[in-house]
């Protein structure tokens, strides 16, 4: 695992954007696994700026999003579909048919999950997976659990995750209690992974995931076994690393 400690959030975001841009330049038909939440917003802004300067071209890129709230339609402003449109897709030339986000309104959850895995397979697998990390060490919506070798699935969100995500909603009661998420097994099949973290609230999770020990209660710790992982964090998130 490579660890890059940047001065602040802006530099962390630009470092991550450069890695994503390099992947696209090296392989214009790259399959990108994308994350949501507050952490990657700066990276997406930097990628849009690169696109506007004609430094990168998304026309042949395929995107695979990590997750979506279950029970939210894509036109709900808090859906991750809306998030991706507002933060990236509306501003670049990615083809709509190459955008893949789980359907939060799927009636048949099992079929949706199996179908999503099939979309990833047809795309050729994920070349570069972008991840954030929750305060409890979750990646995607893979919460602390005794089961890490799982693929796309419906997950019950932990109380801690619901509390963390309530800042995006009017009140905690509006936060969905379930989500569709790519599983750890699928994430680990990506050719390359970058994980971003910013702020002191993530410092404990970063320490736990880099401790050298695998811990099912810290899902991100499994990334230590992947051959090509880059951890890109700011100084606040790195403050507990020995």
UniProtKB/Swiss-Prot annotation:
The keyword Hydrolase applies. The keyword Hydrolase applies. InterPro entries: Glc/Gal-6P_isomerase (IPR006148), Glucosamine6P_isomerase (IPR004547), Glucosamine6P_isomerase_CS (IPR018321), NagB/RpiA_transferase-like (IPR037171). GO terms for molecular function: glucosamine-6-phosphate deaminase activity; identical protein binding. Keywords: Carbohydrate metabolism, Hydrolase. It comes from the Bacteria. Pathway: Amino-sugar metabolism; N-acetylneuraminate degradation; D-fructose 6-phosphate from N-acetylneuraminate: step 5/5. It catalyses: alpha-D-glucosamine 6-phosphate + H2O = beta-D-fructose 6-phosphate + NH4(+). The active site is at residues 67, 136, 138, 143. Its EC number is 3.5.99.6. Pfam families: Glucosamine_iso. GO terms for cellular component: cytoplasm. HAMAP family: GlcN6P_deamin (MF_01241). Belongs to the glucosamine/galactosamine-6-phosphate isomerase family. NagB subfamily. This is Glucosamine-6-phosphate deaminase. It comes from Alkaliphilus metalliredigens (strain QYMF).
């Amino acid at each position: 695992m490579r660890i890059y400690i940047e001065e602040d959030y802006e530099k962390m975001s630009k470092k991550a954007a450069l890695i994503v841009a390099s992947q696209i330049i090296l392989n214009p038909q790259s399959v990108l696994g994308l994350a949501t939440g507050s952490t990657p917003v700066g990276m997406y802004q930097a990628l849009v700026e690169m696109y506007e300067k004609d430094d990168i071209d998304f026309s042949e890129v395929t995107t695979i999003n990590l997750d979506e709230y279950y029970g939210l339609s894509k036109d709900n402003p808090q859906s991750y579909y809306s998030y991706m449109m507002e933060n990236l897709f509306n501003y670049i030339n990615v083809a709509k048919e190459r955008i893949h986000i789980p359907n939060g309104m799927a009636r048949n959850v099992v079929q949706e999950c199996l179908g999503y895995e099939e979309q990833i397979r047809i795309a050729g697998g994920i070349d570069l997976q972008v991840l954030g990390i929750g305060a409890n060490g979750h990646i995607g919506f893979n919460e602390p659990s005794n089961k890490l070798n799982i693929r796309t699935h419906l997950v019950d969100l932990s109380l801690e995750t619901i509390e963390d995500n309530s800042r995006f909603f009017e009140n905690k009661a509006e936060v969905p209690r379930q989500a569709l998420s790519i599983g750890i097994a699928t994430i680990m099949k990506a050719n390359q992974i970058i994980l971003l973290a910013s702020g002191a609230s993530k410092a404990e999770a970063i320490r736990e995931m880099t401790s050298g020990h695998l811990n099912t209660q810290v899902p991100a710790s499994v990334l230590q076994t992947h051959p090509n992982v880059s951890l890109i964090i700011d100084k606040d998130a790195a403050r507990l690393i020995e």
